[in-house]
Amino acid sequence: KFEAEKVLWEVSLKTGLEVTVVRLPLVYGHGVKGNLDRLIKLVQLGIPLPLSLIQNQRSMIGIDNLIDLLIKCIEHPNAAGKTFLVSDGKDLSTPYLINYISTSMGFSSRLFPFPIFLLKFLFTIIGKKKEVDRLTDSLKLDNGHVRRVLNWTPPVNVDEGIRRMVQGK
């Protein structure tokens, strides 16, 4: 990704092409794939998940907010030549996300406590270290720069975005 950005900036310098880089966290919304889709399916199946002790914070952005931001980048003259970190502006813990997905589907979440170090150890043994890190580690993006420069505010709050994603499943 970094190499691609470098190439874009070089092309911009040589040709005068206006470039704006948007760095994304996890994107969620209708038709989501990957780990979030697997998590939704586990909630649907009512499988108990050993994740209640996780105290991470992860930035995310809903597809509706991302589309709104990209339109703003195209239209706003101050976007050219900038790099923006973007998110919905509310960082979520894994248990909060699972609880909200469950509630949006009309279920109660089935989380139970399990030592995080042991969870990480077991996932590492079976070759799923990246997956467990995404569930347990924090990744927070500060979207203050994009809010100030473009006067952008995400039009859809996180809870509504998650509800829309789940309803679209």
Show which residues each predicted segment covers.
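Substrate-positioning beta->alpha
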Residues: E3, V32-R38, S52-I74, G81-K82
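Conserved C-terminal active-site "lid" loop/helix of NAD(P)H-dependent oxidoreductases
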Residues: I63, N99, L122-T153
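A short C-terminal helix-loop "cap" of Rossmann-like NAD(P)-dependent dehydrogenase/epimerase domains
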Residues: I40-L51, F107, F112, D142-G144
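Flexible, glycine-rich beta-alpha linker
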Residues: L17-R38
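Short-chain dehydrogenase/reductase
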Residues: K1-E5, L26-G29, N56-I61, D91, ...
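Mid/C-terminal beta-alpha module of Rossmann-like enzyme folds, strongest
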Residues: K72, H76-K130, D159, R163-V166
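Active-site Tyr-X1-5-Lys
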Residues: K1-T20
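Residue-level signal for the nucleotide or nucleotide-sugar donor/cofactor binding architecture
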Residues: G34, R58-D64, L92, L141, ...
